[in-house]
Amino acid sequence: MSSSFLQLTQVSIEFPTDNGPYVALVDVNLDIAEKEFISLIGHSGCGKSTVMNIVAGMYKATTGGVLLENREVNEPGPERAVVFQNHSLLPWLTSYQNVELAVNQVFKTTKSKAQRHDWIMHNLELVHMTHAKDKLPSEISGGIKQRVGIARALAMEPKVLLMDEPFGALDALTRAHLQDSLMEIHADLGNTVIMITHDVDEAVLLSDKIVMMTNGPAATVGDILNIELERPRNRLELADNEQFNHYRAEVLRFLLDRHKKEVA
């Protein structure tokens, strides 16, 4: 029996192509503790999204597998919620209705209508979006759309929150505000979070561990960096923090080394 909350063991996956099998991942091993915040980082094509899709149950590994609380993951489930870079809100539904859709899917048989309403409002409040509850996606900014997308994911009460470059399309200020909100939510709720990012500073600021992927094809885990910065974290205080800058340099060194090997 595994003692890990979430465990990937010898995960490999290949996809059929006209030129034969494309090997995307080889022997990916990860042990993730409950309530940990993990970032996946690496160059484009290194299999970060593929790892996330396997954990989400949208892809099945060719060999190896995933265990969540010692149960095999082989299909999507409400205990794993995904937030994409594109908010993926349904354009004909209000913010409230977009969250309601997820809540009804998970809780229709276990919560009354009044309880579901309270739960929707609670999750919109978590991301400071109650003021936008009656607005359509076309009526709100990109940052607000992403907040609603996060509320929708949290409303499923997932054990694992999967985030695929959730702030990648946002301006720097909106991104910083959402990073701060995510740190507060993670501290309050204690979800296990796996986030894909290309932003080294974001990874160091948010994470307990940074998983650095080698270049694809046949990508795997190149190194794992434990981030031992005290929480709660303040971005302004960390700007001149020696330990923060050490971690940042370690990740950059790994990425630059991989880039040199690719072009050599």
What is each stretch, according to the model?
Residues 135-138, 156:
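Conserved signature/switch motifs of ABC ATPase nucleotide-binding domains
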Residues 150:
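Hydrophobic anchor residue at the start of the ABC signature
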Residues 93-102:
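Short coil-to-helix segment of the ABC ATPase nucleotide-binding domain corresponding to the Q-loop/switch region
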